[in-house]
């Protein structure tokens, strides 16, 4: 028995058309850096407005981290994004 069909099935479980998204740090409009996060409520609002993401939280370094960012929205570290200019 080949393991390929099993591996393919496991990869496809839970994926529906249009569901593609990833997690990441939204970019600041001013300098392409991660956005400062004073608290999780502010981050959740930032994620909704800047990254079209349904949820987010502050990470350990006071940066806003968003969940389920649509693929067409750039996040920090994406190929082709400009470097952070602090």
Curated annotation (Swiss-Prot):
- GO MF terms, alphabetically ordered: sodium channel inhibitor activity; toxin activity
Function noted in UniProt: Beta toxins bind voltage-independently at site-4 of sodium channels (Nav) and shift the voltage of activation toward more negative potentials thereby affecting sodium channel activation and promoting spontaneous and repetitive firing.
In what tissue types does this protein appear?
A: Expressed by the venom gland.
Keywords assigned by UniProt? Disulfide bond, Ion channel impairing toxin, Neurotoxin, Secreted, Signal, Toxin, Voltage-gated sodium channel impairing toxin
Q: Which InterPro entries match?
A: LCN-type_CS_alpha_beta_dom, Scorpion_toxin-like_sf, Scorpion_toxinL/defensin
Its family remark reads: Belongs to the long (4 C-C) scorpion toxin superfamily. Sodium channel inhibitor family. Beta subfamily.
According to the lineage, what is the superkingdom? Eukaryota
Q: Where in the cell is it found?
A: Secreted
> What range does the record give for the signal peptide?
1-20
Instruction: Provide the disulphide bond pattern.
Output: 33-84, 37-58, 43-64, 47-66
Query: This protein is called what?
Result: Toxin Tpa6
The primary site where this protein sits is secreted
Q: What is the lineage of its organism?
A: Eukaryota, Metazoa, Ecdysozoa, Arthropoda, Chelicerata
**A single Gene Ontology CC term:** extracellular region
The free-text domain note is: Has the structural arrangement of an alpha-helix connected to antiparallel beta-sheets by disulfide bonds (CS-alpha/beta).
Segments forming domain LCN-type CS-alpha/beta: 22-85
């Amino acid at each position: 028995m080949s393991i390929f069909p099993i591996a393919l099935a496991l990869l496809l479980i839970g994926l529906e058309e249009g569901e593609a998204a990833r997690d990441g740090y939204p970019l600041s409009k001013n300098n392409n850096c991660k956005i400062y996060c004073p608290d999780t409520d502010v981050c959740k609002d930032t994620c909704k407005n800047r990254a079209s993401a349904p949820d987010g939280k502050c990470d350990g370094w006071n940066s806003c981290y968003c969940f389920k960012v649509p693929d067409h929205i750039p996040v920090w570290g994406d190929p082709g994004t400009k470097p952070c200019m602090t």
